[in-house]
């Protein structure tokens, strides 16, 4: 399959069960410990109401967050990512000041059998286009120092390391790197 064999779109409010299923699959991936802040054990215990609320919030207009999925011809959700809008003057999850309005990509996942065909770039292209429509000045994401596969995929999607490094939330002896995609104003 190629990236053109998928429909990349925003999730709909009623699709919370599919959101939950894909999240649980992602959290079982071999690199989930360094790719996601949440664990499978925590996620599986969360109430369905949390997934309903996430899906409903993501589907709202206007929204400060939007989740995108890549849907295969057979209806399978092959991958997903979420873009959060961070407002200038707010603080991020580390307590650092957000200096400008920006998108923050989280929850990036593509099922193993759908990797290597350009799908991740198609997801990023759609997410970044939405972020630009929201008036952000750049888009960023964080990636674990040891997640080389993800770093390569992010580079292929146009992201570059910014030089910002933060301690990994689960283990202060490890780091995460900020990657950014910026454009001229």
Model-derived features with residue positions:
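A short beta-loop-alpha structural element at the N-terminal edge
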Residues: 7-21, 33
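Acetyl-CoA-dependent GNAT
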Residues: 21-113, 124-126, 130, 167, ...
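Active-site-adjacent beta-strand anchor residues
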Residues: 9, 143-144
């Amino acid at each position: 399959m190629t990236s053109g064999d998928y429909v990349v779109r925003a999730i709909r409010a009623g699709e919370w069960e599919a959101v939950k299923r894909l999240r649980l699959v992602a959290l079982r991936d071999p690199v989930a410990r360094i790719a996601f802040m949440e664990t499978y054990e925590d996620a599986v215990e969360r109430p369905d109401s949390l997934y309903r609320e996430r899906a409903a919030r993501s589907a709202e207009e206007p929204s400060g967050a939007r989740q995108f999925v890549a849907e295969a011809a057979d209806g399978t959700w092959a991958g997903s990512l979420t873009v959060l809008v961070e407002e200038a003057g707010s603080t991020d999850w580390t307590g650092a000041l957000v200096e400008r309005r920006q998108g923050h990509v989280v929850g990036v996942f593509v099922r193993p059998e759908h990797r290597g065909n350009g799908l991740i770039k198609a997801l990023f292209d759609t997410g970044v286009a939405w972020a630009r429509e929201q008036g952000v000045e750049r888009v960023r994401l964080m990636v674990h120092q040891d997640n080389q596969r993800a770093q390569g995929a992010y580079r292929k999607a146009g992201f570059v390391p910014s030089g910002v490094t933060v301690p990994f939330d689960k283990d202060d002896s490890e780091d995460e790197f900020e990657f950014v995609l910026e454009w001229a104003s």
